[in-house]
Amino acid sequence: MSVIPSSRPVSTLAPDNDFREIHNWTELLHLFNQTFSDCHMELNENTKQVVLFVFYLAIFVVGLVENVLVICVNCRRSGRVGMLNLYILNMAVADLGIILSLPVWMLEVMLEYTWLWGSFSCRFIHYFYLANMYSSIFFLTCLSIDRYVTLTNTSPSWQRHQHRIRRAVCAGVWVLSAIIPLPEVVHIQLLDGSEPMCLFLAPFETYSAWALAVALSATILGFLLPFPLIAVFNILSACRLRRQGQTESRRHCLLMWAYIVVFVICWLPYHVTMLLLTLHTTHIFLHCNLVNFLYFFYEIIDCFSMLHCVANPILYNFLSPSFRGRLLSLVVRYLPKEQARAAGGRASSSSSTQHSIIITKEGSLPLQRICTPTPSETCRPPLCLRTPHLHSAIP
């Protein structure tokens, strides 16, 4: 799933006098096993395999359910409302693609990184994972930017062309994400032997340069460029909402800070670890025990980064009252009539005490929701929004 292969890329770890005697990858891996064994550190590989399997399984089950629900609910809505929903829908598709690749990684872990699925799947599974990983990050970035633009831009030109612009951006993201992994995937090969392994094997003489180039490009495109954009535009959106002083502005501001924090937690450890291991001995020198420690936990950190597939549906969908209402409506459709009537009654009762703003068309003024009060309550006056896009700009 990265430029750090499971067997550890050691062309830069071997001593110079031994390295001159190495002529192919098999000899290099054999030398590495001898060199690495000289660094003693008590780390239980069996425990790590169990932890990885459980972690992968939990992410797979929870992420699969969440993203399928997000896609189902938003597909029903996207034909009628577009708005920022398009980015959320595409991000869920990308996250689902990552989730669907997890069973292969789980089996690979349990087989101690023996690859049993042939040369084609070795490249394709890695390509499929990387393309969806970049897509998810890019759609998250586009969503952060577009949310701020939607909150601040009321020009007629934007109102007329925003649907077309969003569709073009989404298409461009998929194309870009399909191209970016190619330099890495081209050098992913199946190393034959009694226990074949799927590894990043760039040309032997220039392996260090290739590994560094791929690692730097992954960090730049996957973190250093998206993170400032996500942080800046979410902070700007939060400041904009706070100035408006709406009832829900505090909750929305906290959500936007949560978007930033979750992105950092998921991706910063992964990129720092990958860069340290790639730069080791060629540009920096790390102690033997630290290298051993980083290699041991790299796969756990890599797996931990996939938590964004679980966090994204929660942050951008399930915390939204409108999404939960649409999800309940979708569930009610498939319930038996009596249960559906009871669920519908509960949904109606809970929603009658909430005030909401409905956007009938993009760019139109908000209308007051029709309220039918119960004997114990009265209708509250509508909230006045300074922008007609607040409801649609906050998932």
Curated annotation (Swiss-Prot):
Residues 76-86, 146-166, 236-254, 317-395 are cytoplasmic. SUPFAM superfamilies: Family A G protein-coupled receptor-like (SSF81321). GO terms for cellular component: plasma membrane. The chain crosses the membrane at residues 54-75, 87-109, 124-145, 167-189, 214-235, 255-276, 296-316. The modification Phosphoserine is found at residue 329. It holds the Pfam family 7tm_1. It is a multi-pass membrane protein. Its main location: membrane. One of its GO terms (molecular function) is adrenomedullin receptor activity. It is found in: Cell membrane. CDD domains: 7tmA_GPR182 (cd14988). Keywords: Cell membrane, Disulfide bond, G-protein coupled receptor, Glycoprotein, Membrane, Phosphoprotein, Receptor, Transducer, Transmembrane, Transmembrane helix. GO terms for biological process: response to hypoxia. Expressed in a wide variety of peripheral tissues in the adult rat with prominent expression in lung, testis, adrenal and liver. Residues 1-53, 110-123, 190-213, 277-295 are extracellular. Belongs to the G-protein coupled receptor 1 family. This is G-protein coupled receptor 182. It comes from Rattus norvegicus.
